[in-house]
Amino acid sequence: LGLVFFIPYKGARSLAQDRPKNRIHDADVVLSRRLLVPGSDAFKSYYKNHPEVLETDVQSRRATGGLDQLARYYHAGSYAAALANQNVIDHLGTLVYDFKPPSKKEAKVNPEKAGGFIRQWLTRSGAHSVGFTRLEDYHLYSFKGRGPNSGSPIGKQHAYAIALTVEMDHRMMQSAPQGSSVMESYDQYLQSGVLALKLAAWIRELGYDATAHIDGNYEVICPLVAADAGLGTIGRMGLLMTPRLGPRVRIAVVSTNLPLSYQQAIPDRTTLHFCHLCKKCARVCPSSAIPDGNRKIIDGAQRWQIDSERCYHYWVSSGTDCGRCISTCPYSHPDNGFHRFIRWGIK
């Protein structure tokens, strides 16, 4: 497929990465809505204001459920591993806000050297890529939708953000939507969360405030932050498309007031062009949740948007977090010489 893109094409660089103008309420995210307790005041209030999603959400609640023994792709070992990881992640989530406060004295920091140290340290610890950006309003959810502070407004407390990715194993993801893919997914949610938490703790030791944004405790939209930090481009499936691994990564973010050097990210328009023509993820999506048409203006930005209700309903029906789009994306192929050559040709 990549060889087709060696043919010169005038429109290849006409597609630009756009950014949203509006902030998103975390309570509107389907993974937050699933936590609403039927019959509770919060449940009644939400669906009174959003009746358009009530029917689909009720259908999803009636489905087997994620990681359930009655699920279509149930596998005792891999499901238990995923649930074990989720349990640890939930406990790590308590450390996001219940952490040692910053040291009283701020260390003198050279922004460029601090960034270099962070990148080397995290890469040695297992990160695939690390990037830095200024924290923007559109990076943040407007209100919290999960946890004890659900419904609380989210303000911009920090000036900078550090995004990191970790690789999901190619062989494990090739089995998607089988149980081993959800096991790998949770493995890397945990790994990215550990890296973000220890980075936030390190920054506090230097006397600067920092917050880790990990699975179940996001105040930021990680793909947007990672794209602005130069780690990739947001593609057709709504995920971060990294240069070497495509969407086969998990992301975590640390927001902070630690002075950091960053450069304005230059979007890779060739990736957008590839997504514009390829459409493989849309064709293989078992729930037809990925659009196969052109980008549209959504929330003030020109982009593709998946049908998250359809996607999630398949999750709870199959018992895994699917991953078919990730496993079939041509950019997800192993990072070897042949596929690096194909990616070079696409550019």
What does each model-identified segment do?
Residues 119, 125-346:
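Catalytic cores of enzyme domains
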Residues 1-133, 158, 327, 331-347:
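Iron-sulfur (Fe-S) cluster-binding modules
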